[in-house]
Curated annotation (Swiss-Prot):
Amino-acid positions noted as binding heme c in the UniProt annotation, renumbered to this chain: C17, C20, H21, M101
Protein name (database record): Cytochrome c2
GO biological process: photosynthesis
Transport recorded as keyword: yes
Task performed by this protein: Cytochrome c2 is found mainly in purple, non-sulfur, photosynthetic bacteria where it functions as the electron donor to the oxidized bacteriochlorophyll in the photophosphorylation pathway. However, it may also have a role in the respiratory chain and is found in some non-photosynthetic bacteria.
Single GO MF annotation: metal ion binding
Keyword vocabulary terms for this entry: Electron transport, Heme, Iron, Metal-binding, Periplasm, Photosynthesis, Transport
Record has Oxidoreductase as a keyword: no
Length: 126
């Protein structure tokens, strides 16, 4: 997985994500966040197909994007977190598509750094 951001800066920027997200490794250790369960566990998101965490109820649009082949590489992650619903509408070519994530990461460099931080915690290997 290619990463261009600053993981240390991403750790700080990730604070805006912990209201809804947690990063818990395969052994059950919490690497980031507290106990939020609103959004999916972000462990090993970099390199993973979208909408693939078992037991998490994704929006229909996110599930469809994953089935269509969306993989969380840096470029796609950065575009998504800046405008989740807009991204899914464009990706799926469906003006009615909706993302469940309401928060938008306002700054592109923060989104890049958050991706680097998540990659530092674990990368999905096929």
């Amino acid at each position: 997985v290619d990463v261009s951001g600053d993981a240390a800066a991403g750790e700080k920027a990730f604070r805006q994500c912990i209201t809804c997200h947690v990063v818990v490794d395969d052994s059950g250790e919490t690497l980031a966040g507290r106990n939020a369960k609103v959004g999916p566990n972000l462990y090993k998101v970099p390199g993973r197909h979208a909408g693939q965490i078992e037991g998490f109820r994704y929006s229909d649009s996110m599930s469809q994007a994953g089935q269509n082949g969306l993989v969380w590489v840096e470029e796609e992650f950065v575009k998504y977190v800046q405008d989740p619903t807009g991204y899914l509408r464009e990706y799926l070519g469906d003006s009615k598509a909706r993302g469940a994530m309401t928060h938008k990461v306002r700054k592109e460099d923060e989104a890049v750094d958050i991706y680097a931080y998540l990659a530092s915690l674990g990368v999905h290997e096929e």
